[in-house]
Amino acid sequence: MKPSGLTLAFLVVFMMAIMYNSVQAEALADADAEAFAEAGVKELFGKAWGLVKKHLPKACGLMGYVKQ
């Protein structure tokens, strides 16, 4: 028994829908991971910059570059 053209068209559209959903779900997961990574980097940079601002004047003063 040979499948009709309508059956083949339905299967093609169905497979395209499945592929589209899988690609879209993967893109959303990548976007979420990227957002979390950026937030972590910004937080880490903020902490590091706070430490630099806290300790750099003391270090420069000890080396004689900045008079306190």
From Swiss-Prot:
Post-translational modifications reported in the UniProt record: Truncated sequences of this peptide have also been found in the venom. It is possible they have been cleaved in the venom.
Signal peptide: 1-25
Gene Ontology biological process terms, A to Z: defense response to bacterium; defense response to fungus; killing of cells of another organism
Propiece residue ranges: 26-39
CC per GO annotation: extracellular region
Keyword annotations from UniProtKB, A to Z: Antibiotic, Antimicrobial, Disulfide bond, Fungicide, Secreted, Signal
Compartments it resides in: Secreted
Main location: secreted
Expression sites by tissue: Expressed by the venom gland.
Function statement: This homodimer composed of two cationic amphipathic alpha-helical peptides has antimicrobial activities against E.coli, S.aureus (MIC=3.1 uM), and S.cerevisiae (MIC=3.1 uM). It also shows histamine-releasing activity (66.4% at 10 uM) and a weak hemolytic activity (10.5% at 50 uM).
Oligomer status and interactors: Homo- or heterodimer with PLP4 (AC A0A348G5W0); disulfide-linked.
Family: Belongs to the formicidae venom precursor-01 superfamily.
Protein name: U-poneritoxin(01)-Om4b
Biological source species: Odontomachus monticola
